[in-house]
């Protein structure tokens, strides 16, 4: 019988044997120890001398026991693997060692694990051992032992049964990132970490209105002279001389002065006088007065509209009345004639 198949078969028989067969179990255990001891002696003979001059690569392997018996409720395999196995991958990259989780409970499917363990194949012989981590290093002697020591120190941190340590918190953050359920992605705020901000409604008035003061506490007296409606906040009295804001629906705060309106540029800067000033300066009311005061013909002129209107209707607009007009652009002041009422010449139409 081959040595590769002999040890797995012994372990499989020991596990499948009923506990009532005490002597058979003892004999199987002695045979397993004897076989493992012989393999260990051969390996010790081969490793008796270490050649560091040639600097050849050597293979180191250590099996680190996972304390599942001391802490049966803690998931050490999940902590070692991490989200999608990334924790174990990073640990291998950092240490430069190959790590494998072997033994009972290393597979997720327990029924399949039992089938493979009973199959007797050499590659599944580790399923009969205790749950452990196999660390393998293949490198020159000095570097190989350095990597092994580093790997042992790092693997020790993962075998601490703590749910809230730094490793576990980092794995939870990575898991939330991989699942796309970050706080900023879905908007799920953590209790106690967010600050609630009350929204402020924009002012409807031009230039912005002053926000109303905070509501007074219960029992606070309102100022005299203010009207308080049910369900509305009391409005403080407005100081005399203070301009009120132009926004609708907001009350003025006493003592607040609205900022002055922005000073507009003079019209002179935009060149309005250049285009129209010269034309209106020449054609003032004096220019029109000359046409009425000094007629060009000796015969009196009037406009005959052909409606049978006589000259008496135009006598009220004598030329001497137009001579008293002002020479500015301002409209003439209204006449203060209170006595007679003058009929309009076009009143009949």
From Swiss-Prot:
Gene3D superfamilies to which the protein is assigned, alphabetical: K Homology domain, type 1
SMART domains, per the entry: KH
Post-translational modification: Methylated.
InterPro entries, per the entry: BBP-like, KH_1_KHDC4/BBP-like, KH_dom, KH_dom_type_1_sf, Qua1_dom, Sam68-YY
Region (Disordered): 181-263, 321-349
Entry keyword annotation includes Phosphoprotein: yes
GO biological process: mRNA processing; regulation of mRNA splicing, via spliceosome
UniProt GO molecular function: poly(A) binding; poly(U) RNA binding; SH2 domain binding; SH3 domain binding
Modified residues (Omega-N-methylarginine): 230, 240
Subcellular localization, as worded in the UniProt entry: Nucleus
Free-text tissue specificity from the UniProt record: Expressed in heart, skin, brain, colon, spleen, kidney, cervix and testis. In adult cerebellum expressed predominantly in Purkinje cells and in the hippocampus is abundantly expressed in glutamatergic dentate granule cells and in specific inhibitory Schaffer collateral-associated and path-associated interneurons; expression is restricted to neuronal subpopulations largely non-overlapping with expression of KHDRBS3/SLM-2 (at protein level).
Gene Ontology, cellular component aspect: nucleus
UniProt entry keywords in alphabetical sequence: Methylation, mRNA processing, Nucleus, Phosphoprotein, RNA-binding, SH3-binding, Transcription, Transcription regulation
Pfam families: KH-I_KHDC4-BBP, Qua1, Sam68-YY
Ranges of compositional bias, category Low complexity: 218-231
Subunit structure: Self-associates to form homooligomers. Interacts with KHDRBS1/SAM68; heterooligomer formation of KHDRBS family proteins may modulate RNA substrate specificity. Interacts with RBMX, SAFB, SFRS9 and YTHDC1. Interacts with FYN and PLCG1 (via SH3 domain). Interacts (phosphorylated) with FYN, GRB2, PLCG1 and RASA1 (via SH2 domain).
Stated role: RNA-binding protein that plays a role in the regulation of alternative splicing and influences mRNA splice site selection and exon inclusion. Binds both poly(A) and poly(U) homopolymers. Phosphorylation by PTK6 inhibits its RNA-binding ability. Induces an increased concentration-dependent incorporation of exon in CD44 pre-mRNA by direct binding to purine-rich exonic enhancer.
Protein name per Swiss-Prot or TrEMBL: KH domain-containing, RNA-binding, signal transduction-associated protein 2
């Amino acid at each position: 019988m081959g040595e590769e198949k002999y040890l797995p078969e012994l372990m499989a028989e020991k596990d499948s044997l009923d506990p009532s067969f005490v002597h058979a179990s003892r004999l199987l255990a002695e045979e397993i120890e004897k076989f493992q001891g012989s393999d260990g002696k051969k390996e010790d003979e081969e490793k008796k001398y270490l050649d560091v001059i040639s600097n050849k690569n050597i293979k180191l392997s250590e099996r680190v026991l996972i304390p599942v018996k001391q802490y049966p409720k803690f998931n050490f395999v999940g902590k070692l693997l991490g989200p999608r196995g990334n924790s174990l991958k990073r640990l291998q990259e950092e240490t430069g060692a190959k790590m494998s989780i072997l033994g009972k409970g290393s597979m997720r499917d327990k029924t399949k694990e039992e089938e493979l363990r009973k199959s007797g194949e050499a590659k599944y012989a580790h399923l009969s051992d205790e749950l452990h981590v196999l660390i393998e290093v293949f490198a020159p002697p000095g570097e190989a032992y350095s990597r092994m020591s580093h790997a042992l120190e790092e693997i020790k941190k993962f075998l601490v049964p703590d749910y809230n340590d730094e490793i576990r918190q980092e794995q939870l953050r990575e898991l939330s990132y991989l699942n796309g359920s970050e706080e900023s992605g879905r908007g799920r705020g953590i209790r106690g970490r967010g600050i609630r901000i009350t929204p402020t409604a924009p002012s409807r008035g031009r230039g912005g209105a002053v926000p109303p003061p905070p509501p007074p506490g219960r029992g606070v007296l309102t100022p005299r002279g203010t009207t308080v409606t049910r369900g509305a906040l009391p409005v403080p009295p407005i100081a005399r001389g203070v301009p009120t804001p132009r926004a609708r629906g907001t009350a003025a705060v006493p003592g607040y002065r609205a900022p002055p309106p922005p000073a507009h540029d003079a019209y002179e800067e935009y060149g309005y006088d250049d285009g129209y000033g010269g034309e209106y300066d020449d054609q003032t009311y004096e220019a029109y007065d000359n046409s009425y005061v000094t007629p060009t013909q000796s015969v009196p002129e009037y406009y005959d509209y052909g409606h049978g209107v006589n000259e008496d209707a135009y006598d009220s607009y004598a030329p001497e009345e137009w001579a008293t007009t002002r020479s500015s652009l301002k409209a003439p002041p209204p006449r203060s004639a209170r006595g007679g009422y003058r009929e309009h010449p076009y009143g009949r139409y």
